[in-house]
């Protein structure tokens, strides 16, 4: 697998950011970056984690590196960093405020400093088997993946995507019927759910 480190600004990455599960998922980087490819789990960061990402960027502190896979058509998929990227993207589109300030309430200098922050991104090129092995390796740290989430990474496809769409939301029928039995953070993190 070929791996190269790149510095890409938030401004560049989030040009064309869209978060719409029904219409192509979560995309950025002029539509070339699939932030939530089929093997990725749903967004699971709690508000405190999400806010820490924004706080880190605003203070100019280093944010953990991210990994993207380059596809044959020169598009990219997020291998690691989805939670951080969605945290940033949702902040930029006014989904939440930090200290009662939305992104568009920042001063021009604050907004430019935020947008000019450089993300450290390793771009990886390799075959599907190499990408999966790399995905398993880099996901040892951070928000631990359940075994089922690793299985979901191996067996992607339309069936799994459709099942996740219908059964991995806190307002879905499966969650409403069985929420007392879930011993975790809900259907998004159910360790034994075969979504």
What are these regions (language model features)?
Residues 32-34, 38, 42-44, 62, ...:
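Residue-level preference for alpha-helix termini and adjacent loops
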Residues 82-98:
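Short active-site loop/helix that positions an aromatic residue
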Residues 47-51, 82, 128:
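Conserved structured core elements
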Residues 68, 93, 100-103, 110-195:
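Solvent-exposed functional surfaces
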Residues 75-76, 85-87, 110, 130-131:
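Short catalytic/ligand-binding loop motif for oxyanion handling, primarily in non-cytosolic enzymes
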């Amino acid at each position: 697998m070929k791996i190269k480190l790149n510095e890409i600004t938030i401004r560049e990455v989030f040009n064309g950011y869209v978060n719409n599960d029904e219409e192509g998922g979560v995309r950025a980087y002029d539509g070339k970056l699939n932030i939530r490819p089929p093997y990725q789990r749903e967004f699971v960061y709690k508000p405190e984690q999400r806010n820490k990402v924004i706080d880190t960027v605003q203070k100019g502190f280093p944010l953990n590196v991210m990994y993207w896979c380059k596809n044959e058509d020169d598009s990219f998929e997020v291998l690691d960093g989805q939670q951080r990227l969605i945290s940033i993207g949702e902040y930029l589109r006014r989904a939440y405020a930090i200290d009662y300030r939305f992104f568009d309430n920042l001063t021009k200098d604050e907004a430019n400093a935020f947008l000019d922050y450089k993300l450290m991104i390793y771009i990886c090129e390799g075959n599907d088997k190499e990408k999966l092995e790399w995905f398993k390796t880099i996901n040892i740290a951070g928000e631990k993946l359940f075994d089922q989430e690793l299985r979901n990474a191996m067996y992607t496809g339309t069936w799994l995507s459709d099942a996740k769409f219908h059964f991995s939301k806190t307002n879905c029928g499966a969650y409403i019927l069985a929420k007392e039995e879930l011993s975790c953070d809900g259907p998004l993190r159910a360790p034994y759910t075969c979504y």
